[in-house]
Amino acid sequence: MEGLTVGLFGHVEGVGKELGKKGTSTDITLYNYKQGDKAVCYVEPTRYPDRINPLIYEINMMDYALVFIDEITGELGETLLALDMFGINNGAFVVGEYVDLDMLKNIISQTSMKDFEILERDFINIREKMINLNIERDYNGFVKIPIDHYFTVRSVGTVILGKVESGTVRVHDNLRVYPTDKMAMVRSIQIHDNDFKEAKAGNRVGLALKGITTDELDRGMILSNGELKVAKEIEININWNPFMQKTVKEGENYQIIVGLQSVSCVVEEVNKNKIKLSLQKEIAYDVGDKLCLIDGSAKIRILGVGKL
């Protein structure tokens, strides 16, 4: 089974149900579409723009971005800024008939999205295009599965939902639940409600786990058989938001998002682009993962993005 995760951005009201069957829905909503041995999961940031977190989670979950634009509005600015600050260059704009294409091209000309394709709002064609997209995967590396949802199922026990970011996970694998020291065994694997003995990078999975309860889990925890870094204090070079109207100072409280982990933090030191943060709790990450510093209550919510 080949899997792809597509982020839906912009004017997405009513879009998900045109592209797939509605699945799990919390602050993000998943829509699933399957054709033969290929499956696409579309992610919609349901609670955005009220909350910034779903937008960042979606960016960190996806392989490909679809940005729907009915008209060029101010609200679109934060979404385009986030995609650019994360360096997203794999995606397409889906434009309505009244969108000024020259204006759009001008807006994105200096961004990571400058080479995005421009598509018409034809859902049949979009579905076909997405199901046939090829994404480079690491099937042989260590297993890495960030948890986006988890719950208890009677007679099954603890179940987590997530995307296999890398490697191949198999039934009976023992995986560490980062950032904790706890281990969990994979009892069973489901992909789109079908049982499998293994799942590879790109697949969205439901894993039944032995050895851990839902009380011990949090969104963003990572199942892995590799060596991830765990930290409660972080020094990082940040690319600051060019539209930010304030200076981040020592002693201030913010929030960071790394992968699907969201943690409060205090600024310990700031020296131009270099920042030292003390976190409320430990996070797990891989070298190269992105950290997003946010101020959820401010007008400009995304303060900066840096590479760990």
Curated annotation (Swiss-Prot):
One of its GO terms (molecular function) is translation elongation factor activity. Pfam families: GTP_EFTU_D2 (PF03144). CDD domains: SelB_II. One of its GO terms (biological process) is selenocysteine incorporation. This is Uncharacterized protein MJ0325. It comes from Methanocaldococcus jannaschii (strain ATCC 43067 / DSM 2661 / JAL-1 / JCM 10045 / NBRC 100440). The lineage of its organism: Archaea, Methanobacteriati, Methanobacteriota, Methanomada group, Methanococci.
